[in-house]
Amino acid sequence: MTGLERQLTEMLDAPVAASGYELVGLEFIRAGEHSTLRIYIDSPNGINVDDCSEVSHQVSAVMDVEDPISVAYNLEVSSPGLERPLFKAEHYQQFIGHEVSIVLKMAVGNRRKWKGDIQSIEGETVKVLVEGQEEEFVLSNIAKANLIPKF
């Protein structure tokens, strides 16, 4: 998570929670004039288009006042979906036993991309069973992690 993403998460967590939703996480993708702020929300009852619209309006109001992003961007609000992104230690705990795809910031054993089943989370270290071998990844070294849906 970048400094900006951390700042945005802190800024938006309370307004999203006040609306009755969990701020699962967010991503800011820089692409010049086509940058995107993608916000993932969830609730015990799931998420529909009206929920996304409500949160989008609330987030827009906060962003207009705080103005933390200096470039033009598109705001996207969505559910985490089947390939749910994992941002926090609690997310890994919630999905122990599920298959995950992990991309690291810095390679471990000459690899940046890993797939396996989440075994446990201890502090800031997640243990993943990869091809019969348990691997450990520090959360701060994980660039991106998503659940792999089972059909």
Curated annotation (Swiss-Prot):
GO terms for cellular component: cytosol. It is found in: Cytoplasm. InterPro entries: Ribosome_maturation_RimP, RimP_C, RimP_C_sf, RimP_N, RimP_N_sf. GO terms for biological process: ribosomal small subunit assembly; translation. Belongs to the RimP family. Required for maturation of 30S ribosomal subunits. This is Ribosome maturation factor RimP. It comes from Vibrio atlanticus (strain LGP32) (Vibrio splendidus (strain Mel32)).
